[in-house]
Amino acid sequence: MLNLIYTMYLPNFFKVFLLTAFQIIFLSNLIHAQSNCENDVIVQTVNGKLRGVIENNIYVWKGVRYAQPPIGNFRFKSPQSLNNWEGVIDADKFGAVCPQTRNIDSTVKTSEDCLFLNIWSPGISNCNRPVMVYIHGGAFYSGAGSLPIYNGSNLANKGDVVIVTINYRFGAFGFLYVD
């Protein structure tokens, strides 16, 4: 069984992880940031602009796409790089949770379009901060980076660090690769 996990699940999981890490690196090295009102902040990423919010003195971007939606022709494929976009995308709400056999909460929205990450940062200056990427547990069949237990506000505030949580696909949707 462990051999099956190592040969089937982990290679695709690491592709998701590397794609996520690539996006995070560019999000943590913000090119431009501006605040339009008291509680929102717009950042320029390599793919386009994102509007986050300020919560408890922490800059937060929720539901940030890190790959193309894994639907249709991409359903059983490796994650596809994100396309650039025009305009500003609101990043103030968590993205959908990936479908799973063990339901987290009946009120939580699940969807195959679930490749989102969430970012908490103590600031938006150009200074270099450590980035901690937290990949939730769940034995590859349940969980989400948007669960309250993974809220990065406190750690970002106390550790002067950027916190990132991700959603990733489970079961056949996440690890059955058909070429």
How would you describe each model-predicted region?
Residues 17-26:
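Bacterial N-terminal signal peptides
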Residues 2-18:
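Bacterial N-terminal signal peptides that target proteins for export
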Residues 9, 33-179:
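Non-catalytic accessory segments of hydrolases
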Residues 12-13, 25, 44:
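Residues at the start of alpha-helices and the adjacent loop-to-helix junctions
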Residues 25-33:
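Hydrophobic membrane-targeting alpha-helices
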